């Protein structure tokens, strides 16, 4: 099964060759600030399962993390840990159809904005658990 996604203007497109391994709502301040949102929902897939089909994202490295944005319009697309080359995270909202991908965990609740309501049925973590 494949899943397609891309940026807001259509200049950058990708295909995921597998279902996400993890679906996480991240409330950390870095994700909030880079996305301009109260939190970001990430999916994780094996690196080899991400295929760019149009355009190439611009990568910005900071604090052992690499965030990738559409060079054409700035849409936040990917997140990589500089030390973990096995997986890559993608923004669920950048999928053409994000509806099947409900969150499985909430992380970095120590940075959560006070008015954000967390689904109490989700496993929640103060920071990042060992395996997300």
Show the residue positions of the predicted features.
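A short Gly-Trp-Pro
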Residues: 1-132
